[in-house]
């Protein structure tokens, strides 16, 4: 379906679109009004139960972890223990109120968006799905939200506390300078008093421009079928985006007001880091200019700011080849300059946890190989099933899969991360534009550039793989090196590989704290336990010497089950992955 050409055709298409849009919006509103209280009730009761039931454990374990932490100095321990009561009081209040608000918003808007998504191009039985989509699925996801919240409060919390009690490799720990605290606190208070009013005024003054320019852009894209509405499947959502744009502007203003509080309070951090009260005051003035320049760039206004920007650091930070941020997609100005000739190209749908889903595909594939080599044994699987946990299964195997994801991207000279299908690539240009995904993707891109600069040989890559997989078990690492000859390494090269292994395991531990990862891993352990019980009950005649080792069968069956939300069988997944950019991965 091509976009209309000419003013009359565009106007006719627009008038024809209005009743279609109003009908879908009305239906979505009805479903949202019905489901909003139910979803809000489920999320509020579930999250409140998790918060209140774990609160005593959190209080006791947090104090114990801080007191026994090896990464925190004694003075900082006392300071944190004095600040903890305020955090303990605020946590239930903020958590429960956030659950009420989040549950209500999700219960209302999720059916609306699902209603519009049901009439996308190529969707079968559109009339039925207009009524059905967003009803039962929203209720199911509300229970998933509670489960993910429980994983964060339980698994992720204890994982962070355990890491806090571990000593750093360089034997350093964090400490606080008491003499700098009074000045830093005074600067923070001044920043909170000065920055929020000024930044709020700037945001309010720029909000009308953002409102009308956004409407102009959305109407232009809708009629001319450019930008986000280039694909026909996006057209039904166009009217909803136009209608909700004032809410987006209001949210941007509210977000600016809230963030200005933290921006002003950060002046105390600058004062503490620079050991200077004066530099903290300079940051209070410069932060207004920083916000003004950022908002100017977003709104495609002339560069610069009318506010002064004094120097607030003793020494300018010099960017290093690997310490700087990964380049992101440019501002609206850069994007608008590329809009002149819209080329109708296939749309690549990269979802925020697409890389995480590919990680489990890699784990399944490499798990079979590693089990065949004996690097993964039955003891690892037994520990993964127990509450003790297995470092090799829970951290080593995902880190191994991510390592070869990075190495494959390096060999292909990819600007991002090349997925296992050899076609789909996650870059800073097509990745989801939320800050959460920056935290997810950017560390791996930085590590990829570091490995690319190191120029590893195949023997060094294999050694690094064993190092990543068995880094938490030195004895098994030595035995694996005895079986597979270790390449001749200089002290510098060995130190580099050790640093890469520590970095990979650290990043994997961070990823393992994401709620979705934990849900997948629980399904893995559950299926693992079932397969082991089934194996124990099998007769001796079923254990043929021609069969692959038990860990191979177990890992293969684990990662091929529907618990990983892969549509179709393993072969079906492989065929689907070969379609490259046209695939649409369903990740919950």
From Swiss-Prot:
Membrane topology: Multi-pass membrane protein
GO cellular component: membrane
Phosphoserine: modified positions: 486
InterPro entries noted in UniProt: At3g27390-like
Subcellular location: Membrane
Biased composition (Polar residues): 570-581
Major subcellular site: membrane
Signal peptide start and end residues: none
Residue span of region Disordered: 566-588
UniProt keyword annotations, A-Z: Membrane, Phosphoprotein, Transmembrane, Transmembrane helix
Name of the protein: Uncharacterized membrane protein At3g27390
């Amino acid at each position: 379906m091509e976009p209309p050409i000419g003013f009359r055709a565009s106007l006719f298409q627009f008038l024809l679109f209005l009743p279609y849009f109003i009908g879908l919006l009305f239906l979505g509103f009805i479903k949202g009004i019905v489901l909003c209280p139910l979803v809000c009730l489920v999320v509020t009761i579930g999250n409140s139960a998790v918060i209140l039931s774990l609160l005593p454990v959190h209080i006791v374990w947090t104090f114990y972890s801080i007191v026994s932490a090896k990464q925190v100095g004694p003075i900082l321990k006392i300071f944190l223990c004095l600040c903890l009561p305020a955090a303990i009081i605020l946590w239930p209040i903020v958590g429960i109120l956030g659950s009420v608000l989040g549950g209500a918003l999700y219960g209302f808007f999720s059916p609306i968006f699902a209603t519009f998504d049901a009439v996308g191009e190529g969707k079968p039985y559109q009339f039925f799905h207009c009524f059905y989509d967003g009803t039962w699925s929203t209720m199911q996801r509300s229970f998933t939200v509670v489960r993910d919240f429980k994983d964060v409060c339980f698994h992720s919390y204890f994982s962070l506390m355990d890491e806090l009690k571990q000593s750093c490799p360089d034997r350093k720990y964090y400490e606080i300078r008491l003499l700098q605290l009074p000045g830093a606190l005074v600067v923070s208070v001044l920043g909170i008093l000065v920055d929020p009013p000024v930044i709020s005024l700037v945001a309010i003054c720029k909000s009308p421009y953002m409102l009308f320019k956004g409407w102009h852009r959305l109407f232009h894209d809708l009629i001319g079928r450019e930008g986000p509405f280039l694909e026909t499947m996006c057209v039904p959502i166009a009217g909803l985006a136009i209608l909700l744009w004032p809410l987006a502007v209001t949210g941007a203003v509210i977000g600016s007001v809230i963030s200005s509080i933290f921006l002003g309070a950060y002046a105390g951090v600058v004062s503490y880091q620079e050991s200077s009260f004066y530099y903290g005051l300079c940051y209070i003035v410069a932060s207004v200019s920083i916000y003004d320049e950022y908002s100017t760039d977003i709104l495609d206004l002339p560069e610069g700011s009318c506010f002064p920007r004094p120097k607030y650091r003793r020494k300018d930070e010099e960017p290093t080849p690997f310490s700087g941020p990964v380049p992101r997609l440019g501002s609206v100005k850069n994007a608008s300059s590329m809009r002149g000739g819209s080329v109708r190209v296939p749309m690549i749908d990269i979802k925020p946890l697409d890389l995480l889903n590919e990680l489990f595909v890699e784990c399944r594939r490499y798990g079979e190989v590693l089990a065949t080599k004996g690097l993964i044994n039955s003891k690892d699987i037994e520990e993964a099933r127990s509450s003790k946990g297995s470092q090799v299964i829970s951290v080593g195997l995902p880190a191994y899969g991510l390592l070869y994801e990075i190495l494959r991207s390096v060999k292909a000279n990819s600007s991002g991360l090349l997925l296992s299908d050899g076609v789909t690539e996650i870059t800073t240009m097509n990745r989801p534009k939320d800050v959460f995904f920056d935290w997810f993707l950017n560390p791996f891109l930085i590590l990829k550039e570091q490995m690319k600069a190191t120029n590893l040989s195949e023997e060094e890559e294999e050694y690094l793989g064993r190092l990543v997989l068995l880094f938490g078990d030195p004895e098994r690492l030595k035995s694996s090196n005895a079986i597979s000859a270790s390449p001749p390494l200089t002290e510098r090269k060995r130190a580099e590989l050790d640093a890469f292994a520590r970095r990979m395991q650290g990043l994997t531990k961070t990823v393992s704290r994401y709620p979705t990862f934990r849900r997948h891993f629980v399904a893995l352990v559950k299926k693992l336990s079932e397969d082991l019980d089934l194996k124990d009950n099998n007769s001796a005649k079923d254990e043929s010497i021609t069969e692959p080792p038990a860990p191979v069968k177990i890992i293969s069956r684990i990662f091929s089950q529907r618990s990983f939300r892969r549509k179709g069988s393993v072969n079906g997944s492989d065929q689907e992955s070969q379609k490259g950019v046209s695939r649409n991965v369903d990740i919950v």
